[in-house]
């Protein structure tokens, strides 16, 4: 018998603990409900799009692998409940209202939707939630999300499987690097202009440079930018080094 091992095995049960995403944690603080939108939940554990819940077979496999460690909880015990868009995810509690409004004017009782992350929000905002639709989000990082008409047959390390807020299977390809290198070049042009006393609106600067790019050669004059400000898992680089080649 070892106290440390005993606490490790029973700590989740003793504390009523669970694990979740940032959206799920905020939702719990505001409503007291340990729930998660199916899209965000799919980033924590594989989802069965038929049941709109965690993949039961994979849950069983995990618990079987964890059994020798003697935990008195199963994985399902510590995962938040999965909800799809439109389902009741609880209401704002008095405690949650105080977190949002320290003046006390906001009242409790407001119904709250299932918590989702930015990926699910982007799919809904671009109306890309139906089968064979997709959207691209480009910023500091970039990813494409395609709603699948059938399950993938093989494992593709470049693809993460997530879901829409309504539980449809989605293939996501994500890259860490997108606009950081472009922003650095635009900042260089801005600094150049400022050095000559010219004050240029940043939005106008982007617009002019984007339109100027349309006048360039199809092969960009033989110029090539590797925008790896950080590592890139999809191409197996642990660290990034920006490179501009001629």
Region annotations inferred by a language model:
Residues 82:
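Conserved phosphate-donor
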Residues 76:
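Conserved acidic, metal-coordinating active-site core of Asp-based
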Residues 1-39, 45-72, 86-246:
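Active-site core segments that coordinate phosphate-bearing ligands/cofactors
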């Amino acid at each position: 018998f070892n106290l440390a091992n005993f606490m490790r095995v029973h700590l989740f049960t003793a504390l009523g603990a669970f694990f979740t995403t940032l959206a799920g944690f905020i939702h719990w603080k505001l409503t007291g409900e340990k729930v998660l939108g199916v899209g965000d939940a799919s980033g924590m554990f594989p989802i069965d799009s038929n049941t709109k819940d965690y993949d039961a077979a994979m849950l069983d496999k995990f618990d079987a692998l964890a059994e020798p460690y003697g935990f008195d909880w199963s994985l399902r015990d510590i995962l938040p409940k999965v909800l799809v868009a439109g389902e009741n995810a609880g209401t704002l509690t008095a405690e949650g209202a105080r977190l949002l409004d320290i003046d006390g004017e906001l009242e409790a009782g407001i119904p709250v939707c299932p918590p989702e992350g930015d990926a699910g929000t982007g799919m809904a905002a671009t109306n890309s939630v139906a089968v064979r639709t997709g959207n691209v989000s480009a910023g500091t990082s970039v990813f494409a999300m395609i709603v699948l008409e059938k399950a993938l047959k093989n494992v593709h390390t470049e693809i993460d499987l997530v879901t829409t807020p309504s539980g449809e299977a989605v293939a996501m390809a994500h890259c860490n690097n997108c606009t950081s290198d472009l922003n650095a070049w635009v900042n260089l042009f801005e600094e150049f202009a400022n050095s000559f006393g010219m004050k240029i609106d940043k939005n106008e600067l982007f617009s002019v440079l984007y339109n100027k790019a349309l006048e360039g050669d199809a092969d960009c004059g033989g110029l090539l930018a590797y925008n790896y400000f950080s590592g890139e898992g999809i191409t197996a680089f642990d660290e990034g080094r920006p490179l501009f080649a001629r």
